[in-house]
Each structure stands twice: as structure tokens, then as C-alpha cells.
Amino acid sequence: MAVRKLKPTSPGRRFQTVSDFEEVTRSTPEKSLTEGLTKKSGRNNNGRVTMRRRGGGHKRLYRIIDFRRNKLGIAATVAHIEYDPNRTARIALLHYADGEKRYILAPLGIKQGDMVQAGEGADIKPGNAMPMARIPVGTVLHNIELYPGRGGQFCRAAGTYAQLVAKEGKYALLRMPSGEVRKVLAACCATIGQVGNVNHENISLGKAGRNRWLGRRPKVRGVAMNPIDHPLGGGEGRSSGGRHPVTPWGVPTKGYKTRDRKKASTKLIVKRRGQK
């Protein structure tokens, strides 16, 4: 995948870059693996805003992705590499030997016609999935389970990966994209390789409207609000807010540690991110 720079025919296109989609082989999804997607606009089941600055955006069809990789011992052929509007990574359509079709995250380097497999007997090559107990130390992984059978939860965005750095008893030690080293049960499954579409981080949206197409709304600064709306709001003319940065609910932000010290998974973190 390469990044294509647009000609500066307008201010919005001057710094805009787009993917060339060279790895994508089909534009329409597999109908049996799609379902309708209702926009939530950042609201929960009570209709209250739980995620600010969300709303609008282009209509989408949800692609059902196999994060569990629980079809064991059956070889599959990569039929197509497709674009998915619901995530930054590309997805691969698999045709299994028994006739079933499934979508998976497309790893870096996978192409149309390749064979992939899941299970303890699978080869160590991109796209194959197996428990981490069977994976050699030093291997690059993605779509990593946190609990056995729950499905991959770590390293699913474009270009991300974790590295298996050691094994200790029933645990595998992973170096996460953030630099954190943490223990995960070695019985958990992971997929070999790095997530594809690695140049996604180099895309420049170029204009505000392109953010709106993605369903992202403007972010208003606290100091620009009224005092009823934010602790930093109000004042005559332009003001600095008069206190350390806080959220609209008064919780310190911009560097303030908010992680629960008593969180159960803290004991599984060997090295915090940012530590030497």
C-alpha cells in the first residue's frame, strides 16, 4: 500500500493524501457476511451522550469479522482483500475447503490466492492462528486474545503488532505497541504477523469535511465555553481558564494518571509504558 498525494487544486486538497488501495481486489462485500449498522452518534441505550464529538458520517454496512479463528485444522484460500469502512485495517475474505466463507483482518504481506489455517498444527506464517504456547519467542503477532476463546482484542488496528518476548509457566510475555510488557495466558490464540495497511498513519485528511465523513464532530475547547458548560469557561475576553487543565467534570487531565491502582490486571503488567 502506498500513499497518493493529490494535486493542490483547492485549499482542502493541498495537503490531502489518500491510499492508493493497490492491495484491494474487490469493491463490494460478501453479502452473507454483512449486516445493517445503526448509527449511535455517541449515545448509549438511555440516549445519553457517553462519547462526545460523534455523529453524522457516511452510511456503512458492517462486515462480520472472525476474531476468534475457531475453525481449526481446515485450510482456507484468500479469495479477496477488501476495504472495510468500519476499521483502519483491510480485511481478507477466506474460502474454506468445506465451503464456508469468513472475513479476517488482512495481515501485512498476505495476497489473493494464499493459504491460511488456524489450529495448533498450523505453520508459523502470516495469517495463521494458534495458541501462543505453540508460537516461538520473538514472533510478531496481532489479533491477540486476552482470555481464551473470547476472540482477539489486542493489536487490531492498521500497522499494529505485539512481539512475543518470553514464556513463563502458563503465561506469555508480550511487548505491546505502546511499549508496555504484559503477561497473557499462553492458551490464548494470536495470529502471526503484523496488521496490514501500515501506511495508514501517513494519511493526511487535508480538510475538516473529511473528518465529518468519518463521523467525527468538532472538538470545542473548554476555555471557549460558558462557565455553566466547563470549569475553564467564562471570563472577560480571551482567558487562560485560571486553573490546571481539567475535563468538563473537573477531573485533572493532560498527564494525570487515572488508572485504578487496585485493578486486577495490574499484577500482569511487567513494565508500564514509558518506563525505561
Curated annotation (Swiss-Prot):
Gene Ontology biological process terms in this record:
cytoplasmic translation
Report residue spans for region: Disordered: 21-55, 224-276
Looking up Pfam families in the UniProt record yields: Ribosomal_L2, Ribosomal_L2_C
Q: Which UniProt keywords apply?
A: Ribonucleoprotein, Ribosomal protein, RNA-binding, rRNA-binding
Q: Does the keyword Electron transport apply?
A: no
Q: Where is the composition biased (Basic and acidic residues)?
A: 23-33
Signal sequence annotation: none
**NCBIfam families xrefs:** rplB_bact (TIGR01171)
How is the subunit organization of this protein annotated in UniProt?
Part of the 50S ribosomal subunit. Forms a bridge to the 30S subunit in the 70S ribosome.
Q: Which family does it belong to?
A: Belongs to the universal ribosomal protein uL2 family.
What is this protein's record name?
A: Large ribosomal subunit protein uL2
